[in-house]
UniProtKB/Swiss-Prot annotation:
Enzyme class: oxidoreductase
Active site: C130
E.C. numbers: 1.2.1.10
Positions annotated to bind NAD(+): S11, G12, N13, I14, S161, I162, G163, P164, G165, T166, R167, A168, N169, N272
Annotated protein name in UniProt: Acetaldehyde dehydrogenase 5
């Protein structure tokens, strides 16, 4: 079966984990890995796995895009450089899946709103953050039953799983995730907090999701909705697990989740990597299926959507 050829930009934890996810895909093929440090472990790993590599950043990839028929690129660099990366690749007709918190394209959480993005051609979609991918499905599961005035999430992440790129973007991470709790999750006001946990051995990714409903919570319907949503996420992140809840205290609904990774690049505690890379892969697959079916055609654009 024909596959859509992909480039990965950023050779850190997220970019390297992505190679494994994309290699398993029936419709995606990883061809290029782009970095800026010739000595980086990610570039070495990519070469071992048969990818072409460049340490000259996106500019090192541009001359090869057309001859290698690259149609989808994943940006796992930093919010600070994403807009420029996206512009250069969009001009060549490459669709961008943004794994930074830059959020210049529409925000995407696969089980919540992926379908509406694939129906209209977007040349740049944003995956929000690992915390967003782990928690917004639950906020949405509650808000689709009844209105939510406030949604707050706390994500606890193992320090060893957080690379320099994510650390440099923590402010953007917080802002973009808070915004997405409102736009995608459906809460009128959203707040996101990230805790980087230095414990050794590293702890699994943990997420606490709290929502305040306008009316008294309809407990049976909320429980049913949350459990159904967890099953949807588990289709692409098998380690997504309910620890406790939904718990009800007046109008407050609280859900405790844990995310174990598949252990592709980093060990299983790094569920935050997995939920991000799996969501990005799932998103790219949906677009790839449409491209292969001929229902959408990528076109060069002057500026990202």
């Amino acid at each position: 079966m024909k596959k859509i050829r992909c480039a990965l930009i950023g050779s850190g934890n997220i970019g390297t984990d992505l190679i494994y996810k994309i290699q398993r895909s029936p419709v995606l093929e990883p061809v290029w890995m782009v970095g800026i440090d010739p000595e980086s472990e990610g570039l070495a790993r990519a070469r071992e796995m048969g990818l072409k590599t460049t340490a000259a950043g996106v500019d090192g990839l541009l001359p090869h895009v057309l001859e290698d028929n690259i149609q989808i690129a994943f940006d796992a660099t930093s919010a600070y450089v994403h807009a420029e990366n996206s512009r250069k690749l969009n001009e060549l007709g490459v669709m961008m899946i943004d794994l930074t918190p830059a959020a210049i394209g529409p925000l995407c959480v696969p089980p919540v709103n992926l379908k509406e993005h694939t129906e209209k051609l977007e040349m740049n979609v944003n995956m929000i953050s690992c915390a967003g991918q782990a928690t917004i499905p639950i906020v949405h599961a509650i808000s689709r039953i009844q209105s939510v005035s406030y949604g707050e999430i706390v994500a606890s992440l193992a320090s060893k799983s957080i690379g320099p790129g994510t650390r440099a973007n923590l402010d953007e991470f917080t802002y973009t995730t808070s915004n997405a709790i409102e736009i995608v999750g459906g809460a009128r006001k959203g707040k996101a907090l990230a805790i980087i946990n230095p414990a050794d051995p590293p702890m699994m990714m943990r997420n606490t999701i709290s929502c305040l409903t306008d009316e008294e919570p309809d407990e049976p319907r909320i429980i049913e909705s949350v459990l159904a949503m967890i099953k949807e996420v588990q289709k692409y992140v098998p380690g997504y697990r309910l620890v406790n809840g939904p718990l009800f205290d007046g109008k407050r609904v609280t859900v405790f989740m844990e995310v174990a990774g598949l252990g592709d690049y980093l060990p299983k505690y790094a569920g935050n990597l997995d939920i991000m890379t799996a969501a990005a892969t799932r998103t790219a697959e949906m677009f790839a299926e449409e491209i292969l079916a001929g229902t959408i055609q990528l076109k060069p654009v002057e500026m990202a959507v």
